[in-house]
Amino acid sequence: MKKQLIIGTRSSPLALWQAEFTKAELSRHYPELDITLKLVKTTGDVLLDSPLSKIGDMGLFTKDIEKHLIAKEIDLAVHSLKDVPTSTPEGLIITSFTEREDTRDVIISRSGETLLNLPQNARIATSSLRRMSQLLSMRPDFEICDIRGNLNTRFKKFDEGEFDAMMLAYAGVFRLKFSDRISEILPHDVMLPAVGQGALGIETRVDDEQTREIVRILNHSNTEYCCRAERALLRHLQGGCQIPIGAYASFKNGTLKLLAFVGSVNGKIGLRNEITKTGLVSPEQAEEAGIELAKELLKQGADEILSEIRKTR
């Protein structure tokens, strides 16, 4: 058994919360381990002047940490799973999917207005094309404004009066104790989340069996089924965090239900579909369900929507 572990993480407040949470959970199970953090600045942390959709680079928040993992400078990397590309670099693997926090998105508004009660032509801050597409499908009058930076930075910009409302993931808002600022939690029939939203992905080297064995204790089986289904769907659609794709899977007693959305950036076209599979006994079967739903979306015309988006990115 190893005596020391080094966790690689970004330095944002939310990333540090995630890494400290992972450290605490591992220490609870393995009190003899000496666990330290190594902070890594990623491309996504540096390039703050451009919208994520314009940078067009997969792994903006992960690949720099993965370089340290491949070089054996760290033993594991802790990521927000929604930031992790669906294909990991050769020699690396997502070993654990931690138990998922609430996956929904939230609205933060100036006077507590809910989404549909926001004023005409309201300025909504989000860096996500997925959110933009679904917002504009409901309210074409909204002006969508790009916002970058960590959660504290975003709240500072919002409080300075730049926007009428801001959309964020509930998980991050809750973890950093901003829950009292939430005006509305959006249900999945209104806003489907990003693939993997609310879960942490713990990445290790494939050949580091000792670390994989240690980290595997943090894996949450239901979350793994759900996230592997969602990630398989995204992989088959050849999407990423810069593409308007949303998905949410639930899994209970061997039954997986997967909802998915693909839309145009302007919100004028939106496809939704779902699939239910029973008797699942392995995460690989969950992935097969994700691929099956992706194929159905492609038949509906998702390929035309996504091809058009890629031309302009």
Curated annotation (Swiss-Prot):
Family matches, as PROSITE patterns: PORPHOBILINOGEN_DEAM
Enzyme class: transferase
Cofactors named for this entry: dipyrromethane
Reaction equations catalysed: 4 porphobilinogen + H2O = hydroxymethylbilane + 4 NH4(+)
EC number: 2.5.1.61
Pathway: Porphyrin-containing compound metabolism; protoporphyrin-IX biosynthesis; coproporphyrinogen-III from 5-aminolevulinate: step 2/4; Porphyrin-containing compound metabolism; chlorophyll biosynthesis
Keyword hit for Ubl conjugation: no
Cellular component, GO annotation: cytoplasm
Keywords of this entry: Chlorophyll biosynthesis, Porphyrin biosynthesis, Transferase
Cofactor note: Binds 1 dipyrromethane group covalently.
InterPro entries (alphabetical): HemC, Porphobilin_deaminase_cofac_BS, Porphobilin_deaminase_N, Porphobilinogen_deaminase_C, Porphobilinogen_deaminase_C_sf
GO BP terms: chlorophyll biosynthetic process; protoporphyrinogen IX biosynthetic process
UniProt modified residues of type S-(dipyrrolylmethanemethyl)cysteine: 241
Keyword Transferase: yes
GO molecular function, one term: hydroxymethylbilane synthase activity
Miscellaneous comment text of the record: The porphobilinogen subunits are added to the dipyrromethane group.
Subunit structure: Monomer.
Family: Belongs to the HMBS family.
Function: Tetrapolymerization of the monopyrrole PBG into the hydroxymethylbilane pre-uroporphyrinogen in several discrete steps.
Protein name in the entry: Porphobilinogen deaminase
Species annotation: Chlorobium phaeobacteroides (strain DSM 266 / SMG 266 / 2430)
